[in-house]
Design a protein with these regions (language model features):
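N-terminal secretory targeting modules
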Residues: 22-194, 203-207, 225
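Phosphate-binding active sites in nucleotide-utilizing proteins
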Residues: 208-238, 251-252, 257
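Catalytic His-Asp segment of secreted/periplasmic serine-dependent ester chemistry enzymes
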Residues: 277, 316-395
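Bacterial N-terminal signal peptides that target proteins for export
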Residues: 1-9
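Structural recognition of the beta-strand scaffold that forms the well-ordered cores
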Residues: 190-195, 199, 230-235, 265-271, ...
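Bacterial N-terminal signal peptides
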Residues: 8-18
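Oxyanion-hole/transition-state-stabilizing segment in secreted/luminal serine hydrolases
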Residues: 204, 236-291
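Surface-exposed amphipathic alpha-helices with a cationic face
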Residues: 296-304
Length: 395
């Protein structure tokens, strides 16, 4: 009862009646409501001392219970979790904790647990109502030093060491919190946004929108509950389809970052530009359209084996990015033609058409280009989120 009282205040909205009504129509299921794919730290990324990370998380699905996954899948050392808590934020932005009590999370009955290198732990359910678009603060304390990968993404987070008198200061690193799931009687679909830095939200400045998947979640939130999909962002900056770039390749991490998401019904795959850009222009180190198409088909085969539909995203313009060239642009165009052919995926999201310049199709629209000619700015990411045909996400 104490949990219900606390988290009813945390949610800011009593959903008991809504949940009860929905329960009459469908049995509750666990569904992904937020995600952040694990990625390795670089050799130059700094080590953090024992301390606490605070993550501000926006849910994309409502439910009557929550479960957290804390991951060290790409870590370089074993970690010791000293404790995990959930609380309400003090305001519309930032990581300050509000006046409501802090709720302690347990893992198989324990507050403190070991998190070995390469492992993930899942919390016990928190039984209480949560609503769509609700922000919560998840605090993860480590008794050991940690080394998270750095990032330029706008996700709001802060860190404080365990030393006496230490205060929380903003930090830009990849979170150890990898998945938030909710139990819902109305979770008709769950979408995993899968890709590289463009999906990850690199250079995006809107902390809680976090790239085009956040804009997609906003659009879905406006639909009736019976049509509202949760959105889980599993983009990783630098990721590739065929080979390990940053973190495990798309084909290998499918099982970790897609299959493990509860209730996943759809994947929107936007990946391949790093394969093309990092490859050579010719010879054995060049990436050909046929190689990427093969990779896409392998990804789709994995998804279809689990009953998951895959929408293919066309690769966005990048001719003037540092690692591209006219030869590689021809490869991008050939890959996009194959994606648009409707012969690979269950549907297509034409991200390229959403952001390309009408006069120079190999470039982004100037108003969407922050200057690196590769990663769309917030306006461009919003246009990409608007490009998804919501009818393709019907269960």
């Amino acid at each position: 009862m104490r949990n219900l009282t606390f988290l009813a205040a945390l949610s800011g909205l009593a959903l008991a009646a809504t949940t009860a009504s929905a329960s009459a129509h469908a049995a509750p299921v666990w569904a992904g409501a937020w995600g952040y794919a694990p990625a390795d730290a670089g050799s130059g990324d700094p080590e953090q001392p024992a301390g606490t990370y605070r993550y501000r998380v926006r849910l994309t699905q409502a439910g009557d219970a929550m479960q957290l996954s804390i991951s060290n899948a790409e870590g370089d050392r074993p970690l010791g979790i000293a404790g995990v808590t959930i609380s309400s934020p003090s305001g519309p932005v930032g990581t300050e904790i509000g006046a409501n009590p802090v709720h302690t999370i347990r893992f198989s009955g324990l507050q403190a647990v070991a998190l070995p290198k390469g492992h993930t732990v899942v919390s016990a359910p928190i039984i209480a109502p949560f609503h769509n678009a609700q922000d919560v603060i998840v605090s993860v304390s480590f008794s050991t030093p940690s080394k998270p990968g750095r990032t330029n993404l706008g996700l709001e987070m802060a860190f404080a060491p365990t030393t006496p008198g230490a205060t929380f200061t903003p930090i830009k690193v990849r979170p150890y919190l990898s998945l938030v799931s909710v139990r819902s009687s109305q979770a008709p679909c769950t979408v995993v946004a899968f890709g590289d830095s463009i999906t990850d939200g690199f250079l995006g400045l809107s902390p809680q929108t976090r790239g085009w998947p956040g804009r997609l979640a906003e659009r879905l939130a406006a639909l009736p509950a019976s049509q509202r999909c949760g959105v889980v962002n599993m983009g990783i900056s630098g990721n590739r389809v065929l080979k390990q770039g940053r973190a495990t390749s798309a084909l290998d991490r499918f099982w970790r970052d897609v299959a493990s998401v509860p209730n996943v019904t759809h994947v929107i795959l936007l990946e391949g530009i790093n394969d093309i850009g990092a490859g050579a222009e010719s010879g054995p180190d060049a990436v050909t359209p046929d190689q990427l198409i093969y990779g896409y088909r392998q990804f789709v085969a994995r998804a279809h084996a689990l009953g998951i539909k895959v929408l293919g995203g066309t690769l966005t313009p990048a001719l003037r990015a540092g690692y591209m060239s006219p030869v590689k642009e021809q490869t991008r165009q050939a890959v996009n033609a194959a994606i648009r052919s409707q012969k690979i995926f269950d549907g297509v999201v034409d991200f390229d058409a959403a952001v390309r310049s009408p006069t120079v199709p190999a470039d982004m629209k100037p108003e969407f280009d922050p200057g690196d000619h590769l990663h769309p700015n917030d306006a461009g990411l919003r246009a990409m989120g608007d490009a998804v045909n919501l009818s393709l996400l019907k269960p």
